[in-house]
Amino acid sequence: RNTLYYIVPYIPLMLAASLVVAQILSQTRRGVTAFRVLYDIPVLTSWVAASLIWKTVLSPEYGALNNILALFGIDGPGWLLDETWAMPAVVLVSVWKDMGFFGLILLSGMISIDRGYYEAAELDGAGPWQKFWKITLPLMSPSIFYVLIVSLINAFQLFPQIMIMTDGGPNGATQVMVERIYKYGFRYYRMGYASALSWILFVIIMICTFIQMKGQKKWVNYDS
């Protein structure tokens, strides 16, 4: 259940953030180079280091986020200690970490689109929003499909940020499938149970991937 609670907001948020990153990186305006450096930092940072940093930032006592909120008179929650906020906090940290990598993949699909389509659309009076929805998104669909496949598999394999930031707490609010497999296998030494959970996870991922592969025929456009 917690794994699903993580996946449902993570996938659309990550995809939206990655599209924004790709759109910004595709521009040639001043300041884009600096943005490229900033977006590279989360990608190059290991999950262990990133999780430790965010665990400190989200600390209720001395965390930077709650200190900033206090300046505006807002009493911030115990992000990783509150059952309501723990999983949303993990989701947002994961989006921050992954959007650079997936944004780069989407960027490769975006810059491969023939500029002639946009020129023809401009002659027909299409605006930026119309060009994005009618040209960019349809022709980027193979890249978007790849991102959806990989991000869904990664989401099912959620582990390091949970172990470091929450350890499955509070009260099991962030205990996900892989973290449960790890604990039963290497803390409680119930290898049989952990192996069974691993096979269940494998089957779930395989079924979801199969459904995505079948469904992509209806919306993915491989013709440029």
PLM regions and their residue ranges:
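A structural signal for multi-pass alpha-helical bundles of membrane permease subunits
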Residues: 1-224
